[in-house]
Curated annotation (Swiss-Prot):
Its main location: cytoplasm. Pathway: Purine metabolism; AMP biosynthesis via de novo pathway; AMP from IMP: step 1/2. Keywords: Cytoplasm, GTP-binding, Ligase, Magnesium, Metal-binding, Nucleotide-binding, Purine biosynthesis. The keyword DNA repair does not apply. This is Adenylosuccinate synthetase. InterPro entries: Adenylosuccin_syn_GTP-bd, Adenylosuccin_syn_Lys_AS, Adenylosuccinate_synth_dom1, Adenylosuccinate_synth_dom2, Adenylosuccinate_synth_dom3, Adenylosuccinate_synthetase, P-loop_NTPase. It comes from Neosartorya fischeri (strain ATCC 1020 / DSM 3700 / CBS 544.65 / FGSC A1164 / JCM 1740 / NRRL 181 / WB 181) (Aspergillus fischerianus). Binds 1 Mg(2+) ion per subunit.
Length: 424
């Protein structure tokens, strides 16, 4: 089994969907490792637009079997809604090619209610969550009181555990805008419908042990990782390479490539430090030209220049074997393009390849930039590297050199599926 892992290298929304879609055409197995319906990416396949949240995007490939792994949290209504949407758009057999680990956890509507209450209590220190209940669900998992997908099948156990969760949150917050008995009633239907999808993950992988090409689809990104990201402004799961190996019980020696997906500039949704953010006309231009609105929340993304300090840190943790640089065309109309090359701390310390753990300290750093000349010409839809303007190639090659020679193998030049350069 050869395993390819696709990971976000910044704060998410890098455009992982397109490379995942492309690689899934050769994959026989596609897996989601972590996260839930807080993730979101869009794929345009045969002129049809698909929005993915919890489902693996390998479903667009008719020969690809898909797994939602043990490290995920699954909002069951969203699972069925998303599956129905795919089937309505022509993927009629999608339901026969998707499975869920019985060890994945259930994200309830209760968790979404609690998410909103917890954010409200934080006031001006809000994390900026998607409000989907992901954090409270992972909190319940860590506290050993969560409900696993497999436990839905035992009606008595399921109802006891959900009522216990509800009682615990009611004791903490008071009366909630949530009816536990109503949710229990809905799961009487979901229980029957889930039966064909739920599997023992290890037995599933043994069944597909001869799969020549397995694709692991990362959600969110390294800088949102619970351990390595800009804590506490992170998601609640392990979004890096280590998290994928753990969640899917992967054999590390079978990993053949780790692809880091990086935007040609930087974006972030929600709260938290963002050293290269541009609160000026450059940030506004990146936001408007790049159509930077979240797939899941519709929120406006914060925008800034490409950050080498961040990407060196990301590379050191995820060990990318190749990069996919996306949305190069968004930079077409800039006279000059800046790249963050160092952070200077308040005491004068200069950082180039380490990332402070202290979120408050990150808010205080000064950023050193280099300026590179823009290319002021259209790269939309370019499919050959040699057809790019010289300054666009120079920008890409500068990033390669500064990231220690990790090759930029794929370059996104537009929204369409074939707007991609593949460098051999």
């Amino acid at each position: 089994m050869g395993i390819t892992i696709v990971l976000g290298s910044q704060w998410g929304d890098e455009g992982k969907g397109k490379i995942t879609d492309m690689l899934s055409q050769q994959a026989t197995l596609c897996c989601r490792a972590a996260g839930g319906h807080n993730a979101g990416h869009t794929i345009v396949h045969e002129n049809i637009t698909y929005d993915f949240h919890i489902l693996p995007s390998g479903l667009v490939s008719p020969s690809c079997v898909n797994l939602i792994g043990a490290g995920t949290v699954v909002h069951v209504p969203s699972f069925f809604k998303e599956l129905a949407s795919l089937e309505e758009k022509g993927l009629k057999d999608a339901g026969k090619r998707i499975f869920i680990s019985d060890r994945a956890h259930v994200c309830f509507d209760l968790h979404s209610v609690v998410d909103g209450l917890e954010e409200a209590k934080l006031g001006g220190r809000k994390v900026g969550t998607t409000g989907k209940g992901i954090g409270p669900c992972y909190s319940d998992k860590a506290a050993r009181r969560g409900v696993r997908i497999g436990e839905i099948m035992d009606e008595a156990v399921f109802e006891r555990k959900l009522r216990s969760l509800h009682a615990g949150y009611t004791a903490r917050f008071g009366e909630l805008e949530y009816d536990v008995e109503e949710e229990i009633g809905r799961f009487k239907d979901y229980r029957k419908r889930l039966v064909p999808y739920v599997v023992d993950q290890l037995a599933f992988f043994k069944q597909y042990k001869d799969s020549p090409n397995t694709l692991v689809e990362g959600a969110n990104a390294l800088m949102l990782d619970l351990d390595h990201g800009t804590y506490p402004y992170v998601t609640s799961s392990s979004t890096g390479l280590g998290g994928a190996v753990q969640a899917l019980s992967l054999n590390p020696t079978s990993i053949t490539s780790v692809i880091g997906v990086v935007k040609a500039y930087t974006t972030r949704v929600g709260s938290g430090p963002f050293p290269s953010e541009q609160l000026n006309e450059y940030g506004d231009k990146l936001q408007s030209v790049g159509r930077e609105f979240g797939v899941t929340t519709g929120r406006r993304r914060r925008c800034g220049w490409f950050d080498l300090v961040l990407c060196r840190y990301s590379q050191a943790i995820n060990h990318y074997t190749a990069l996919n640089l996306t949305k190069l065309d968004i930079l077409d109309d800039f006279d000059e393009i800046k790249v963050a090359v160092a952070y200077v701390l308040p005491d004068g310390t200069r950082l180039t390849d380490t990332y402070p753990a202290d979120a408050d300290l990150l808010e205080k750093v000064k950023v050193e930039y280099v300026s590179l000349p823009g290319w002021k010409s259209n790269t939309m839809g370019v499919r050959k590297y040699e057809d790019l303007p010289a300054n666009a190639r120079a920008y890409i090659e500068y990033i390669e050199r500064e990231l220690g020679g990790v090759p930029v193998k794929w370059i996104g030049t537009g929204p369409a599926r074939d707007h991609m350069i593949c460098r051999e």
